Amino acid sequence: NGVVKFEGTSLMNGGDGLLHSADGAFNKFTFGTYIYISEWVDGAFLFKKMDGNSTIIAFQMGATANSLKLSIGSSVATVTTPDLATGWHYIGLTYEQGTAKLYVDTNNTAINFVGALPNEIPNTRTDFLIGDKFKGYLDETFVSSLVVGTSGRNPITFDNWNNSKILAYWKYDDATKPGKD
C-alpha cells in the first residue's frame, strides 16, 4: 500500500539493535528490499552502521551506475548488477562468514561480490541507518538473521519458522507512522 521516499537529504533510523547481539557477532544475515532508484548517487547508503567515522557495516551505491559495495570494518567488496537504474527491482544482499552475494529480481542465481570480507560483523551497538544520500523509493525492507536470497519475495512473506529469524521488516503502509515495523 505504501513506499518510503528518500530525496538524498534524510534517512531512516532502524535502531541500534540490528546486527548486534548479546550472544556475539553476526556471521550471517540478509538485507532485502524492493528498490526504485530516481538518481544514481555515488556513495549513497542503502544502509549503514557507523561508530563515529568508523564503518561497522555499510551497503552503498558505487561510482558508476549498477555498481554496489559492501564494507565491513575496513574491508570492501564490490558487485556489478543488472540494470538497477530503471524501474522497480527486488534486491537481496546475503552475507555468510565473509561471503557476500546479491540476488536481483526473480533470479535465484546470485551475483558474487568481489573482495575479501571478514568472517563476522563487528558487534558494535550503533544505529542501523537506511537511505542516507539515497534518491529513490524503498518498499518492504527487511533484515533477517538467515541467508534467504529471493525466498518469500513478491510479496515478501516468511513461513512460521522464519518469522522468528526476522530482525526487522518495514512495509511502509502507515503514513502516520513512517518507519513503523
Residue ranges of each PLM-predicted region?
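Flexible glycan-contacting loops in extracellular carbohydrate-active proteins
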Residues: N112-Y137
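Short hydrophobic/aromatic patches on beta-strands that form ligand-binding or substrate-lining surfaces
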Residues: T30-E39, F47, I91-L93, I130, ...
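Short sequence motifs at beta-strands and strand-loop junctions characteristic
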Residues: A25, P82-A85, K135
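Extended recognition patches within non-cytosolic domains
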Residues: N1-V3, T109, V114, Y137-D181
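Short structured motifs
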Residues: M12-L19, S74-V79, L129
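Extracellular glycan-recognition modules
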Residues: T9-K69, T99-A100, S145-G152, S164, ...
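Extracellular glycan-interaction surfaces
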Residues: N1-S10, F31-V41, I56-E120
